[in-house]
Amino acid sequence: MKNKYKSVVVEGSIGVGKTTLATMLASSLESKLMLENFSENPFLEKFYKDVGKFNKYTKTSKYALATQLYFLLQRADEFKGKEYQALKRHNIISDYFIEKDKLFAKSILSSDEYRLYNRVHDGLKLDIEKPGLVIYLQTDAQTLIGRIKKRGVKFEGNITEAYLQKIIDSYTEFFHSYKDSPLLIINTSNVNVNDPHDYAMLLEEINKDIKGKIYFNPLS
């Protein structure tokens, strides 16, 4: 099946299944795959250790700003690099959305840090074409914790439900008013993309002329 969209972005909280679905779609839709590279961030493991202390009183980490600036600059380099320019000649499926940078920054940085982050962000003058389709994967924080434990990345073991709920709330707020691209919302508590029936229904939905915001609820 050909991909009718120049670019498709799969987004959602950590552990929700972005990379799995993006990889499947790239194969099914004969598209190039662009994956987030988080393993090179030298601050991420330290940040997640602090996240283990996250609660309603402690809402940030001394590594939060460095973590977010590293991701921002890394992604800016990727989108300006030769590899991405070559990828743009093809249809692309990605497991991250450049907009998520500001979403996470706003969620985890202090007000002073966020102002500094915005100065760096705005100074980069990133001009990236809006996706042809955004797929937003949802589930609850408790389910995410179970999936994170199952995949067994050691430093992710410090992630708490409180932290995940804050990220979920940030995504919900962001996509509530998002209108820049067609938006397909999937609750992965009810939809299993690894199930052949659900996945076939999803491909059928993606192949439609999606406009605005729709929720994917296949019949069982």
Identify the meaning behind each predicted range:
Residues K18:
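Conserved lysine of the Walker
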Residues S27-Q74:
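Conserved substrate/cofactor phosphate-moiety recognition/catalytic segment
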Residues D101-D169:
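A glycine- and Lys/Arg-enriched "phosphate-lid" helix/loop adjacent to the NTP-binding pocket
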Residues V10:
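Hydrophobic anchor at the beta1->P-loop junction of P-loop NTPases
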Residues Y63-E129:
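Glycine-rich phosphate-binding loop used to anchor ATP phosphates in small-molecule kinases
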Residues G146-N158, A162-S220:
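NTP-dependent small-molecule kinase module
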